[in-house]
Amino acid sequence: MVEESQFESVRSREQRPHESVDIRSTFESVSVVIPTVREQNFTAESLPDWIEPELATEEGLNIARNRGIERTDGDWIVLVDDDVTFPTRLTAWLIDAMHPLHVAGLEDYWPMNGILGRFMIFHRSLWKHVGGFDESRPHGGDTDFIVRCRNTGGAVVRLPRRLI
């Protein structure tokens, strides 16, 4: 005999769940932060006109990340480098499926098992809980942030680098 839950899973696959994600309404609770020192910002140029990014120009990458996040008010933070085509639809789908203890981003290089700061999504409450990015670190702030997220119970969702 087939249980009801098995029927439900078949139905949900057939319904294409991501088609029902309203991208604009998902982004109502999102802040896009782009640390940058460049005059031309390819990422900002690739954003839909209804997304207003926070350009963080402070000296020091981790300082810029933290100050940019502090100036925003979205529950979800998308931290992204200044030289990519912003994946609007992918970002909305990920956020729609995420829990506040999730951190999603591009997989780090082997043998590391974290994610890169090139594209990273997390909830503001997790960022606050772990104390943000360590501003005393000139390098490796993304790795340190992920380690501290994991140590506090966060789950890391690693995406293939080729996505972005």
Tell where the protein language model's regions lie, with residue ranges.
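Acidic donor-binding loop at a coil-to-helix junction in glycosyltransferase catalytic cores
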Residues: 139-145
